[in-house]
Amino acid sequence: MLMFDPVPVKQEAMDPVSVSYPSNYMESMKPNKYGVIYSTPLPEKFFQTPEGLSHGIQMEPVDLTVNKRSSPPSAGNSPSSLKFPSSHRRASPGLSMPSSSPPIKKYSPPSPGVQPFGVPLSMPPVMAAALSRHGIRSPGILPVIQPVVVQPVPFMYTSHLQQPLMVSLSEEMENSSSSMQVPVIESYEKPISQKKIKIEPGIEPQRTDYYPEEMSPPLMNSVSPPQALLQENHPSVIVQPGKRPLPVESPDTQRKRRIHRCDYDGCNKVYTKSSHLKAHRRTHTGEKPYKCTWEGCTWKFARSDELTRHFRKHTGIKPFQCPDCDRSFSRSDHLALHRKRHMLV
């Protein structure tokens, strides 16, 4: 009985090859459902004898299918060691197998690092009798029959010899891919991007990123490349008070008087509020929209706060009182001057 490993092998395309055999041998193969056909014709002494050829035996062509890459020929033609090449369809009477048996694999040549193996096969008496008729003597055990494929099998599978190699290769690829996914560069860049600046109390840092469009060109290019590299290498910077005065056009100064500038010729006044700029423009135009409503008073003012202070003269209201004495004032600036006198005494 044939003993084979049921591990599947990879299927390859078949090409038809015609080989001639004796008619009596072909007739003995017809009743069998399964069979093995050799990719290369066996020696003539197996199937052709001088006696058979002299009696006029007719040779018939047989359509066979073999692999494109035929397996290497057998090592020797001795009767005791016989190796059959790649896949076939029909078999001799002694190699018939029942339909319930598992599919027999196709043998693929092992890799250079793997030792070849053989499957011992017991020679049934029917096959021994068939081979003895053609001049072959069998010792009872045929050492190795490498590839045997049964026709009803619809597809082939990969040999089990390649499976350990494929598994080890996939494991190595997984290990290599997992080691390549370590973000080494990002871990070093993140701490550098987070910079802390230590500032002494009483000094406000220059906010150059708030209003970069308002900075003058000399201030934008004031930092030289060596200083920029020094700042990159030393993220912690300590600003000492009193070492350098703030420039005239510093960002803080620009932020306080950045937009509201008088556009009259010869006037360079700048205001932080648009209402103050409007009141200043009235000094150029002479417009005084705020008129006193007190009866008999014709005073007009360009600013509303001026009208408010004027109206307190009519009412006598003095909301600003000194905390050190009982005096009161109608204007806040008058109260500030009075308190300075208390400090000087």
Curated annotation (Swiss-Prot):
Keywords, alphabetical: Activator, DNA-binding, Isopeptide bond, Metal-binding, Nucleus, Phosphoprotein, Repeat, Repressor, Transcription, Transcription regulation, Ubl conjugation, Zinc, Zinc-finger
S-S bonds: none
CDD domains per the UniProt record, alphabetical: KLF3_N
UniProt motif 9aaTAD: location: 60-68
Domain of life: Eukaryota
Entry PTM: Sumoylated with SUMO1. Sumoylation is enhanced by PIAS1, PIAS2alpha and PIAS2beta, and PIAS4, but not by Pc2. Enhances transcriptional repression, but has no effect on DNA binding. Sumoylation on Lys-198 is the major site.
Chain residue ranges for the region called Disordered: 66-112
Subunit structure comment from the entry: Monomer.
PANTHER family xref list: KRUEPPEL-LIKE FACTOR 3, KRUEPPEL-LIKE TRANSCRIPTION FACTOR
Protein name (record): Krueppel-like factor 3
UniProt lineage: Eukaryota, Metazoa, Chordata, Craniata, Vertebrata
